[in-house]
Curated annotation (Swiss-Prot):
Pathways involved: Pyrimidine metabolism; UMP biosynthesis via de novo pathway; (S)-dihydroorotate from bicarbonate: step 3/3
Binding site for Zn(2+) 1: H53, H55, E138, D291
Role of this protein: Catalyzes the reversible cyclization of carbamoyl aspartate to dihydroorotate.
Source species of the chain: Halobacterium salinarum (strain ATCC 700922 / JCM 11081 / NRC-1) (Halobacterium halobium)
Annotated Gene Ontology cellular component terms: cytoplasm
Protein name (database record): Dihydroorotase
Active site: D291
Record keyword Zinc present: yes
A GO molecular-function annotation: zinc ion binding
Note describing how the cofactor binds: Binds 2 Zn(2+) ions per subunit.
Length: 422
């Protein structure tokens, strides 16, 4: 058995971590075993990030991303499990479409993975729930990339079906009736934020929680971008996630980002961003997930009403959070909880998310003092850009998936990622 010696855990304790193949055998002091890594009480060791919200674009949009490129980017960013969303081509609204996507993931992903099922008027719940779905969603309450927005009746039906199958429903919560159509006369980059209002999110969260509760479904709100949305989710007993772009960017950044800062839901005012970050720090936000949604530079360079929505983020999420922890803005315990422990608990991943005996050895080693600027040219996504250009992050020195080194600080290694639901 191999030992990581004198690792600093998220809570500051210095412990040995002994690995037995793919699993953690023990966490303690003075553990016997072959020395694997001497952390020397300098390196922090965290459980690998579970990114419950990525768009790896395959099948259908491989020029933007593939399972190979997206999972390499994940590994280099300390992400050991990814969950792909349904809006590919074909969308994963049938069992056959899930099988097709899962085959790509099984062949090419170097991290563990899950596939979500989607809901449209053409969905086939019988075949869909016959597959090993990670969750149902994101279910779109307003149109986004892929035109998968659904009406209230179909959402209610989807919640009832998911409840009967004991599958979590993840929700893209925006109410199109609350969009400000007056903003459509504008052509500046901020027009998108003005159009898709904060009120649209809060109203949709309240509606989603109400319908989900009536149906007996477990509701998780995706990419919550406003403090009001977080509060509405909590009030209704739902869990929620926030993204790095909503935590670290605001409408103030749109002068520099232009259409590269268009996403759904959009960037909010800086006071709202600060209030969202406060909810991250104090525990009201359950999960950080990236909504990694890459597009090419050429695609994003269109005008604000034609540019596709979405930004990459799977490689920079954990580094940005670790940078915030290094600056004292966030505790390492919160980083651990929102990136690993909580996603594992919310989605029932019994082998993931915790550094404990019997869990998968999904681990990230970081030197907390090794902060550096983020540059798109250094990242591994096919899209080759980042909205966080020039921001400071702390990147992993090593990433392990089930005990195998998939990132050594310089190179991504081959590895057969597995479906976490099988």
């Amino acid at each position: 058995m191999r030992v990581i010696r004198d690792a600093v855990l998220a809570d500051g304790r210095v412990r040995d971590i002994r690995l037995d193949g793919e699993r953690i055998d023990a966490v303690g002091t003075a553990l016997d075993g072959e020395l694997f890594v001497d952390a020397n009480a300098d390196y922090r060791v965290l459980p690998g990030m579970i990114d419950a919200h990525v768009h790896f674009r395959q099948p259908g949009f491989e020029h933007k991303e593939t399972w190979a490129s997206g999972s390499r980017s994940a590994a280099a960013g300390g992400v050991t499990t990814v969950v792909d969303q349904p809006n590919t081509a074909p969308p994963t609204v049938t069992g056959d479409a899930v099988d097709e996507k899962a085959a790509h993931a099984a062949a090419d992903s170097v991290v563990d993975w899950g596939v979500n099922g989607g809901v449209t008027g053409e969905w086939d719940p019988a075949s869909l729930f016959d597959r090993s779905l990670f969750a149902l969603g994101e279910v779109f309450l307003a149109d986004s990339t892929g035109d998968m927005g659904i009406d209230a009746a179909l959402f209610r039906d989807a919640c009832q079906r998911a409840a009967s199958e004991d599958v979590v429903v993840t929700v893209h919560a925006e109410d199109a009736d609350r969009f400000d159509t007056a903003a459509k006369s504008r052509s500046d980059a901020d027009a998108w934020s003005a159009y898709r209002t904060p009120e649209a999110e809060a109203a949709a969260v309240e509606r989603a929680v109400e319908v989900g509760t009536e149906a007996g479904a477990t509701i998780h709100i995706a990419h919550t971008s406003t403090p009001e949305g977080v509060d509405a989710a909590a009030a209704g007993g739902a869990t929620c996630e926030a993204t790095p772009h909503h935590l670290f960017l605001s409408r103030d950044d749109l002068d520099d980002l232009g259409t590269f800062g268009r996403m759904n839901p959009p960037l909010r005012s800086d006071p709202r961003r600060e209030a969202l970050f406060e909810r991250l720090a104090d525990g009201r936000i359950d999960v950080v997930a990236t909504d990694h949604a890459p597009h090419t530079r050429a695609e994003k360079a269109a005008d604000i009403w034609d540019a596709p929505s979405g930004v990459p983020g799977v490689e920079t999420a954990l580094p940005l959070l670790l940078g915030a922890a290094h600056r004292g803005e966030l505790s390492y315990e919160r980083v651990r909880d929102v990136t690993a422990a909580n996603p594992a608990d919310v989605f029932g991943l019994e082998r993931k998310g915790h550094i404990a005996a019997g869990r998968d050895a999904d681990l990230v080693l970081v030197d907390p003092d090794d902060a550096r600027e983020i540059h798109g040219d250094d990242l591994h996504s096919n899209c080759e850009w980042t909205p966080f250009e020039g921001h400071v992050g702390v990147f992993p020195a090593m990433t392990l998936v089930r005990g195998t080194t998939v990132w050594d600080g310089d190179t991504v290694s081959a590895f057969d990622g597995r479906n976490v639901r099988q």
